[in-house]
């Protein structure tokens, strides 16, 4: 028996080397047969890109953006440039840099998006960094941040429409930042195109040399190949020194479920790699870099980012709190804090339009809060404050740069986060000047002083005005002036910058501008007008708080500060619309709109009525009157003590657009 056991042990020990040898030879072979090709597919392009980038000095970097009026072809031109450089396949996608669903649905750019490109010019590789910027005035903050990453810009003008209001605004914004501007005339293939008129407008309005302009069709690709050599020759390379301590600007950020907060950064000096320890100047918090890379066009990991580049980083452990990522913040390596001067950052945009947002189901409040915080991480121009309503429960007071900004944010909440929300109509801030000299900005109508307080303690009420620039064909001049005058506007200037195009400037109350002014303007000009505006200070105004009362009890979710000229119209609209959504009660329901102590409109909902005369003889008049009086008295008592039951869906329907 013992001999058998020894034989087994000997055989086992004898077999082990061969087994381990066989397994060691077979196992790597199995690894190579499965994972190596997959790694080759993923890593080979990245390594080729990285090798090419490593060989390019900063003198052959070019950072540029495309700026234009909305719908002049920025995103389509971006697609053609990405195809030309081989970053994407030709015809593989449309509007690659319009990544949000709402951008594709509306056909506008909302978020400034970035992409790095490699381009060989005269035998030398160049690293080009492209930023596709929004055109609408509501997203001006996105445009301003984009300029911090760029040394120049392609100023794009539609050959059929010419210079528009936001072309002018974006030009002066880029000019103020010191960007080198390259004029580009787009859509020259259209039958209605007039490139010479657009060139003349650029020369007369911006003093840009027509000889330096490039005439293209982004849709067909005509002359697009001439753009990149022009960018290389005319736009300067970024300035930076990779041997200096790291100095890195946070340009944008977004949230990933697995990576935490991802930062889009522009390196002014130094280098950054995975594993580096960095510190924020704004918060003092320290982080370990988990990965660095470029957008090509999606996230493409790199071993290093150098001075002059724009790329992304995320940390390990991840940055989980969105409040830590402050756009405009400067980062450097731990230990270099005293050697680095922080960058100036960005001017904080001021919210101009405010709404209240409530979840349809009160139990969804935590989900709504989390969704809003994630969106604000990607859009820092939104302001946020918690508030509550007796009618609608817990919610938020949100501030935006304009009504389109608000509408897009609402769409993103619904599409990207599945939020079911109730949004109140947009309002603007108002200024209260108290008799003791203090000034207060009111953004929530519920906090507006009551009538007695206004008389006793307030010196003056003011509302914000804007300077609106409107461009449109000359034939609609009369209609546009009439529209502006009916909205309490004051004309400032009128000029013809071509024989048929007009630039009209009006000072308008911001409250009128957010009340679908742009929609009315489009209607008056058959869609040919464009609008841009900027702040124009505060003015004294005759304003009051309009409230909705149900049986003399104010409904806190429905109140608004309006000019005296709007009180009657809005009051009548409110009571008639609210009446449609309130169910009948056992007693009469009175719906009123009141400005201060003055009731400006009223509607009544008749109660359910029981036929108390059903069993009476037709000739019994005395008994008939007695029963009707008794029913009437009973209703009065019920009305005095009863509460009106208003369903949550009634508010939802009333506040719906």
Curated annotation (Swiss-Prot):
Keywords: GTP-binding, Hydrolase, Membrane, Mitochondrion, Mitochondrion inner membrane, Nucleotide-binding, Protein biosynthesis, Transit peptide. Promotes mitochondrial protein synthesis. May act as a fidelity factor of the translation reaction, by catalyzing a one-codon backward translocation of tRNAs on improperly translocated ribosomes. Binds to mitochondrial ribosomes in a GTP-dependent manner. It is found in: Mitochondrion inner membrane. Its main location: mitochondrion. It is a peripheral membrane protein. NCBIfam families: lepA, small_GTP. It catalyses: GTP + H2O = GDP + phosphate + H(+). PROSITE patterns: G_TR_1, G_TR_2. InterPro entries: EF-4, EFG_III/V, EFG_V-like, G_TR_CS, LepA_C_sf, LepA_CTD, LepA_IV, P-loop_NTPase. GO terms for molecular function: GTP binding; GTPase activity; mitochondrial ribosome binding. Belongs to the TRAFAC class translation factor GTPase superfamily. Classic translation factor GTPase family. LepA subfamily. The keyword Amino-acid biosynthesis does not apply. GO terms for biological process: positive regulation of translation; translation. This is Translation factor GUF1, mitochondrial. Residues 59-239 form the tr-type G domain. Its EC number is 3.6.5.-. The gene is GUF1. One of its GO terms (cellular component) is mitochondrial inner membrane. GTP binds at residues 121-128, 185-189, 239-242. Residues 1-39 form a transit peptide.
